Amino acid sequence: MAIKKFKPTTNGRRNMTSLDFAEITTNRPEKSLTEKLSKKGGRNNQGRLTVRHQGGGHKRKYRIIDFKRNKDGVAGRVATIEYDPNRSANIALINYVDGEKRYILAPKGIKVGMEIMSGPEADIKVGNALPLVNIPVGTTIHNIELKPGKGGQLVRAAGASAQIQGRDGKYVIVRLQSGESRLFLGTCRATIGSVGNEEHELVNIGKAGRSRWLGKRPTVRGSVMNPVDHPHGGGEGRAPIGRSGPLTPWGKPALGLKTRKKNKSSDMYILRRRKK
């Protein structure tokens, strides 16, 4: 999809950009694959704020996505490519020959009418899903499982991709988008190709109200809060932090402190750390 620019008819539209949605073929989702999505506003079941900057936004329905891609040996055809308000990537509706319908993440280059397949015998073709052990070295992949049968958990955002680097016994070495090289069990599945809608990151929101439509609330600096709300708060006028270094709202060191748990069980599968 191309980036659409606007004339500066107002200050809010001066630098605003948007996707032109040329790839989208329908604006109505498949009703059987949607369900109610109630807003939480970043609160937990006690009503306490656990995730900041969430709240409001346009009403949405959740689209049920097939991340497992476990319909082996049954051919499916791409019926539509649709917008999904719950993720940065677009989604594709697949009509299988046995009558079932499923949504998948729309890979780059997929078109209406294309045929896709899942399983160890599937061709190495964009949109097909196979176990990692059946995918040749150097192939670009996305929607990667961490545990066999659990469904894809990694490389699902718009424009994201990973690459098969090699094999090591029952494991496959995959280079992720972050630069990290990691071992995955060969029986874990992945989908061929990269995720579509790669221009998503180039969109300029343009104005605060558009962020509110997306359900994003403002981010307030700690230095303009009261001392009760943030370690940087208080003082007369623009006061310095008054600490040896910047802190999070909960009093823990910020900016540069490593937060990954030491001796994490998955450390043994990471061959090369991600780029800084």
From Swiss-Prot:
Start-end of Basic and acidic residues biased regions: 28-38
Region (Disordered): 28-57, 219-276
GO molecular function per UniProt: rRNA binding; structural constituent of ribosome; transferase activity
Top-level taxon in the UniProt lineage: Bacteria
Signal peptide: none
InterPro entries listed in its UniProt record: NA-bd_OB-fold, Rib_uL2_dom2, Ribosomal_uL2, Ribosomal_uL2_bac/org-type, Ribosomal_uL2_C, Ribosomal_uL2_CS, Ribosomal_uL2_dom3, Ribosomal_uL2_RNA-bd_dom
GO terms, biological process: cytoplasmic translation
Alphabetically ordered keywords of this record: Ribonucleoprotein, Ribosomal protein, RNA-binding, rRNA-binding
GO cellular component terms listed in the entry, alphabetical order: large ribosomal subunit
PROSITE patterns for the chain: RIBOSOMAL_L2
Function: One of the primary rRNA binding proteins. Required for association of the 30S and 50S subunits to form the 70S ribosome, for tRNA binding and peptide bond formation. It has been suggested to have peptidyltransferase activity; this is somewhat controversial. Makes several contacts with the 16S rRNA in the 70S ribosome.
Family: Belongs to the universal ribosomal protein uL2 family.
Assembly: Part of the 50S ribosomal subunit. Forms a bridge to the 30S subunit in the 70S ribosome.
Designated name of the protein: Large ribosomal subunit protein uL2
Organism of this sequence: Exiguobacterium sp. (strain ATCC BAA-1283 / AT1b)
Gene, per the UniProt record: rplB
